């Protein structure tokens, strides 16, 4: 992990419970910092990002589809719903837990989950939240999202956030994050940034020189300073053609990567309309890669 991954500044969570049972996180910013506010400490913390899933809400293959991608025997062409695992030697953080979460985690070592970051409330990003139950045997799990997503989680999964939990339900602590606040999960520093999923405000997340953004259609220019210095970008790219009202296409993702100035970019949240993985990768410019399920990258 880059030096920016560890901050010299300590960020404290406001642990005061609100009447809704959602713990709010007070915004905290380092003094004198730039847009991202990351430390230039010389400390290093190695980390790995594993793509647990790289597909859209339908996954790939798509039920009922007989296109060459959906019939492909190449494992790179099979995509579970989008999710990722960020790990250092001490800390494990999940980004989104869709309906394939159980299947995605079976090949992974069974170790404590220190935090769960949710980008937004859509089912393909939260439908597997009940499947974190086994990990709660290792300790409660802190869940982080924007305020609207926290409200949606309480509405959609009320039994997980009731005042009096019955035996066997996940033990989750829900935290509403303000945009651009800095939090520390173990030795991982996290900064949420605002993204527009069509008309829906959602979160992308920055971790030092890594940024993870999915389901984006647009981003306000005011958010760009919070991505300054990002070297590895993960961003959604639905397909090559036919504009979508709430997701960007591959050409838009490539242009966004150039605006950010990322050294390398991995495209995720991909449909079968991207085409066969090997052929589609050849169409991409240098430094832009199609992510695939199970891919691990050092960050």
Task: Pin down the residues of each PLM region.
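A generic alpha-helix propensity feature with a strong bias for hydrophobic helices
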Residues: 30-33, 228
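Cap/insert and terminal regions of metallo-dependent hydrolase folds
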Residues: 218-299
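Binuclear metal-dependent hydrolase catalytic cores
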Residues: 2-30, 37-213, 222, 279-299
